[in-house]
Design a protein with these regions (language model features):
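A residue-level signal for conserved active-site and pocket-lining positions in enzyme catalytic cores
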Residues: 11, 56, 259
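Conserved catalytic-core segment of nucleotide-activated headgroup transferases in glycan assembly
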Residues: 63-77, 223-305
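Active-site and donor-binding regions of nucleotide-sugar-utilizing enzymes
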Residues: 17-214, 218-219, 251-253, 266, ...
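Short secondary-structure boundary/capping segments
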Residues: 46, 174, 231, 305-306
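Structural motif
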Residues: 150-152, 244-245, 274, 311-312
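Membrane-interacting alpha-helical segments
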Residues: 1-8, 12-22
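Nucleotide-activated donor-binding/catalytic signature segment of Leloir-type glycosyltransferases, i.e.
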Residues: 95, 99-108, 289-312
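Short, surface-exposed amphipathic charged segments that create phosphate/polyanion-binding patches used
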Residues: 121-125, 219-226, 290-292, 312
Length: 312
């Protein structure tokens, strides 16, 4: 199976190179530490005697937030050191911001080609591997299995689409899932689906989603809300003149332009409408600046300081 996967992966990787190049150019940020994607992490010292190095992989920003309780739990054992990797550039930035003083090392997960994966394994030298949600990388799991390294899948979930696809290739699905030593399903449904795909009951438990274990920041007080309104330029003289605020959260290309058109129509209809844009990928900042410069409404980037007073 692994040789068949490798034969398919190489041409797929070559075909994807133009896409990666375009993505790096358009979004910026994506090229940061790109050598990690080729398995070329900074060289880590070999684990000291009595230390257990765990390779923890979280795909993107959501998973990076969700693993916080898991990291806290692992750190209760002083013999454990964590190497954290993530797949997306935004996840990498968030991981460095949140965990740089809490884990041993932070990097970007390598592309699942045998040469890159093998290089990463030689540099990280983990004693155990923890994956999150639905990450079943054949080469990564093969390297773990070949070395006799235990692998764990936490918050394991199988979407409707993935479940149907795996059912079409049952033998391959079983062989892939067999390389996971323990699975902790996000729900009873996910557990049932994984069992139908061939996971023995002794290897799986339904533990619920770790995202529910993340502590939520307390609601802002009145003074904090006032400060935030000032920073955004949404200050009003009285409660009666508070603007209508529209939020575009985790937006993708094309969605910001649509929201701007809606805002302009609302203003033309007499509504004091303000728009907050929070792109899913912060690296798209230059692209959004060009878009905002091309339309008539005043705008402000919060990271550049206090907002405009009563912007149009």
């Amino acid at each position: 199976m692994i040789w068949f996967y490798r034969l398919l992966y190489l041409p797929g990787l070559l075909l994807a190179l133009p896409y990666y190049g375009l993505r790096m150019w358009r979004r910026g940020g994506y090229g940061k530490d790109f050598q990690h994607r080729l398995g070329r992490f900074r060289r880590l010292p070999s684990p000291q005697a009595g230390k257990k190095r765990i390779w923890l992989q979280a795909v993107s920003v959501g998973e990076v937030f969700a693993i916080s309780p898991l990291i806290d739990a692992l750190q209760q054992d002083e013999s454990i050191e964590i190497v954290l990797t993530t797949t997306t550039s935004t996840g990498y930035a968030e991981a460095r911001k949140r965990y740089k003083d809490r884990v041993f090392s932070i990097g970007i997960f390598p592309l699942d080609f045998w040469l890159f994966t093998r290089t990463a394994w030689k540099r990280i030298q983990p004693a155990a591997v923890i994956l999150t949600e639905s990450e079943l990388w054949p080469e990564h799991l093969h390297q773990a299995h070949k070395r006799g390294i235990p692998t764990f899948l936490v918050n394991a979930r199988i979407s409707d689409t993935s479940f149907k696809r795996y059912q079409q290739i049952p033998k391959l699905a079983r062989r892939l899932l067999r390389k996971l030593d323990h699975l902790y399903a996000a729900s009873d449904l996910d557990q049932a689906r994984l069992c139908q795909l061939g996971v023995e009951k002794a290897r799986i438990a339904s533990t619920g989603s770790i995202k529910f274990d993340v502590s939520i920041e307390p609601r802002l007080g009145e003074a904090e809300r006032t400060t935030l309104r000032d920073e955004l330029g949404f200050t009003s003289e009285t409660a009666d003149t508070q603007p209508f605020v529209m939020l575009g959260s985790s937006t993708w290309p094309g969605e910001e332009a649509a929201l701007l058109r809606i805002q302009q129509k609302a203003i033309q209809a007499g509504v004091d409408c303000r728009l907050l844009l929070v792109p899913r990928h912060a690296e798209r900042g230059p692209e959004l600046i060009r878009l905002l410069d091309s339309q008539p409404l005043a705008w402000h980037q919060r990271s550049q300081g206090a907002g405009l007073k009563n912007p149009v």
